[in-house]
Amino acid sequence: QKVYTLLAFRPGPSYHTKYVDGIELGSRSERCHFGSRIFNIRSNGDERYARRPYRIQFRYNSTLSAAVRWDNKHKGIICDHLAPSKLELVERWFAYGPDFSYDKIYWSKGKWQIEESYPLIQNLDIAPTNSRVPTSLDPKR
């Protein structure tokens, strides 16, 4: 049975949500359905899962922007790691935003896995003071 992966976006008034979702295609008589057991992930930032999730959600403040995209060089989905602006605002998604670190979601052994704190920034001893941060992301995207 074929399973596809969808990167989706749902805007909201106080927080936006980006999804990584599995789509299973049924036979001709069945319709496709969203959500699939293709994730071998027990946590994503502050979200903890009792069971393997059918989809992964990235929720963050609607005035900010967060990256969730496929990168050919790293062979996976690279996403901004999201964290609350203050420790007391854990799980209040309107207070979440990128914290300048990255996570990588990659395909291994028939499931999507996650590697938190994935090192994208290369060869830096001191952080640059301008916007020219050298990362290993594909510059064409």
Kindly give the residue locations of the regions a language model identified:
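Short catalytic/ligand-binding loop motif for oxyanion handling, primarily in non-cytosolic enzymes
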Residues: 14-15, 87-88, 122-123
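Short aromatic loop motif centered on NTY/YTY
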Residues: 10-11, 31-107, 116, 128-131
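Charge-rich, low-complexity intrinsically disordered segments
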Residues: 115-141
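Acidic/His-rich structured neighborhood in mature extracellular/periplasmic domains
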Residues: 1-11, 16-19, 27
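Hydrophobic residues embedded in beta-strands of well-ordered beta-sheets
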Residues: 2-4, 75-77, 112-113
